[in-house]
């Protein structure tokens, strides 16, 4: 039985194809399946006993490519094999798949606008990571603007993290991550050399959880050795 995620996936796909059919000519499909066996090493495991479980993650991706506008859909199913929520071997409703990513991009002059639900990796995943090593991964919902500059690239983003409309009734109390991130290339030092300054703000009025973060990271290449 189709769940709400699959229905939203299908509706979004068909609406986009219908609206952009006049210039969209390319469609790229891809799929992957990852199986992983893990062992439990906690103190709860009795001596001379082995406790293990299996994780499985599958993804189906579709890219709809137009002249200036593109749409990207990634439907993901992530589960631990054999858990009761799967209803394995039993007639019933299983846990549902979900849209891990669904976003649209528009290519303008020196700028790219991206809106929807997407992964965001900054600073070689040291600043913000996709967390794809786990069984689910991390994605954000919001707006991302990329602008090419003479010295590299600038990113501007705003990402609502927690919506509190049903409890606080005040937009200022929503949890929002926003900021700017620069990729500044340094060809005079090495081909792959760059510095990445950033400014970020996390808004969480409750419990005084808001904070600002300033910093930078650097990749410096010398004689083909990257530091």
What does each model-identified segment do?
Residues 1-10:
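Bacterial N-terminal signal peptides that target proteins for export
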Residues 14-16:
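Hydrophobic alpha-helical segments of integral membrane proteins
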Residues 22-117, 143-149, 216-225:
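Beta-barrel outer-membrane channel/assembly domains of diderm bacteria
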Residues 26-28, 64, 107-113, 131-227:
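Signature for the C-terminal beta-barrel architecture of outer-membrane proteins
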Residues 36-44, 76-87, 118-131, 159-167, ...:
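Sequence/structural signature of outer-membrane beta-barrel proteins
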Residues 98-99, 127-129, 139:
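Short acidic (Asp/Glu) patches
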